A protein has these predicted regions:
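Catalytic cores of nucleotide-sugar-dependent glycosyltransferases that transfer UDP/GDP/TDP-activated
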Residues: 1-482
Length: 482
């Protein structure tokens, strides 16, 4: 069986969010049962020398969009520690000129042009390489055009005649919505796709709606999120469409790469440890206190937050409760970037409080050290399709404090239940979050209970093995391949 993954970002080459981790790790678990190729843009931030990314010979290709020819080139390397080919599509006008995966302040129309061009280039390069995929696995709105192309422009193309499509929703809030004329730029058959059973949504083109309608299976990244998006509260005006295709909707929990996130071998840590030696974890806490200029006190727990600084992640709750957090017997490390107002708030807190320190930006090595150093990991998301941060935190023995939504509900067993590995609150407001934090601080004073919970968290299995089997069964079901 041949599986083609298409995504805007793939770890470790390019990463802005959890999508990169999923596409960079799930194929590893599938490799023994399928032949896999991954396609992603060659962003300007990708280090070609570091990852030994080389240009494919005679790969220059010209494609026309909006009556303008555009030049593409193909580069390739292997996914680390695998035999999986990762193909990078280079275009100087749309991707290679930017140092970020998702540059800020782009013209929205231009953003659509970027991923239309990428999606069509994926189709054409797969043909040029003779990679006749049994299943194309598209991810989020950036590659939502692929199911539409399969249904329209390539509908009678013999090369794609037996190809099925899986579309994965990592975050329903970002759907790719623009005016009807974007279909002309895409050279897409408007008479076929622009209707209520295709991509038309409130007199606009909605790429995600089209992908949901035309894909053979639609995957949400956790069972709870799959149920939530069928409701008006979480459905982002797409719940009606999703209820209509509920027969092909699946909820499969994401995992993390246990080789990448491994406190026993992680070189970013001051001291390595595992579930049998998590007393050594304290050395990482001391290192983080030194790094951020906090006064170390073993009786004060460290609470970390590593997140995009946007409303979805519950940063407004931290803003609302900032005075209360300063008065707790705990220290805080906040890391992230995003909304300018939240970035400025974090900088102010770092400069004007005794127990809160922040890092505005993202540093993967520092993030791993903070995971290892922290006693608790705060994740008060308004909604969370799956969430990987709480899985990483538990892997490193940091107990998550989460709101019971989406993948957080599926992965965290809240205190005081048996085998609890974290703490939950149920209402999205600052006082409920504060009460959950206070509960965690109370447990911290009882080292027997705290260490039992830490052991339970570190022994929780959120590797890709179980989820990969569900994906593989789904691929086989729609392709009739074994």
């Amino acid at each position: 069986m041949k599986i083609l993954f298409a995504a805007a970002e793939v770890a470790p080459f390019s990463k802005a969010g959890g999508l990169a981790d999923v596409v960079g790790s799930l194929p590893k678990e599938l490799e023994k049962d399928a032949e896999i190729a991954i396609f992603t843009p060659l962003h300007g931030c990708i280090d070609k020398d570091k990852y030994k990314i080389k240009e494919v010979e005679n790969s220059e290709m010209w494609l026309t969009f909006g009556n303008q020819p555009h030049k593409f080139n193909l580069y390739m390397t292997k996914l680390p520690n695998t035999k999986i080919n990762v193909f990078f599509i280079k275009n100087d006008w749309y991707f290679s000129c930017f140092k970020e995966v998702y540059p800020k302040y782009l013209d929205p129309r231009y953003e659509h042009e970027r991923y239309i061009s990428f999606s069509l280039a994926v189709m054409e390069y797969a043909k040029a390489l003779n990679f006749r995929a049994d299943v194309i696995h598209a991810n989020d709105w950036h590659t939502a055009m692929i199911p539409l192309y399969l249904h329209s422009n390539y509908k009678f193309d013999e090369f794609w005649a037996n190809t099925k499509c899986v579309f994965e929703i990592h975050n329903l809030a970002y759907q790719g919505i623009w005016f009807e004329d974007v279909l002309d730029f895409a050279n897409m058959r408007k008479d076929i796709v622009y209707n209520q059973w295709g991509c038309e949504h409130y007199n606009r083109v909605n790429w995600m709606k089209g992908a949901i309608n035309y894909s053979d299976r639609v995957v949400a990244v956790s069972p709870t999120y799959a149920r939530e998006i069928l409701t008006p509260e979480y459905g982002e005006n797409m719940d009606y469409t999703l209820r209509g295709v509920q027969y092909k909707l699946r909820g499969i929990l994401n995992g993390i790469d246990y080789d990448v996130f491994n406190p026993k071998k992680d070189k970013a840590l001051a001291k390595n440890y595992d579930v049998k030696s998590f007393d050594k974890k304290e050395q990482n806490k001391k290192a983080v206190y030194d790094h951020f200029g906090l006064k170390y006190n073993p009786d004060r727990p460290l609470i970390a937050l590593i997140s995009r600084l946007v409303d979805q992640k519950g940063i407004d709750l931290i803003r609302d409760m900032q005075d209360e957090l300063q008065n707790l017997n705990a220290d805080f490390i906040f890391m992230g970037s995003g909304n300018n107002d939240y970035e400025n708030l974090f900088i102010w807190l770092s400069n004007n409080t005794k127990n809160i320190r922040t890092y505005v930006g993202y540093d993967a090595k520092l993030a791993n050290l903070v995971y290892a150093a922290s006693d608790f990991f705060l994740m008060p998301s308004k909604f969370e399709p799956c969430g990987l941060s709480q899985l990483i935190a538990m892997r490193y023995g940091s107990l998550p404090i989460v709101i019971a939504t989406g993948g957080l509900e599926d992965t965290v067993t809240g205190y005081p239940l048996d085998n609890s590995n974290g703490f939950k609150f149920w209402q999205y407001n600052g006082w409920d979050m504060l009460n959950a934090i206070k509960c965690a601080l109370y447990v911290y004073t009882d080292k027997y209970v705290f260490n039992a919970m830490r052991k339970s968290a570190m022994e929780s299995d959120f590797s890709w093995k179980r989820s990969a089997k569900q994906y593989l069964d789904m691929y086989r079901e729609i392709s009739n391949k074994k």
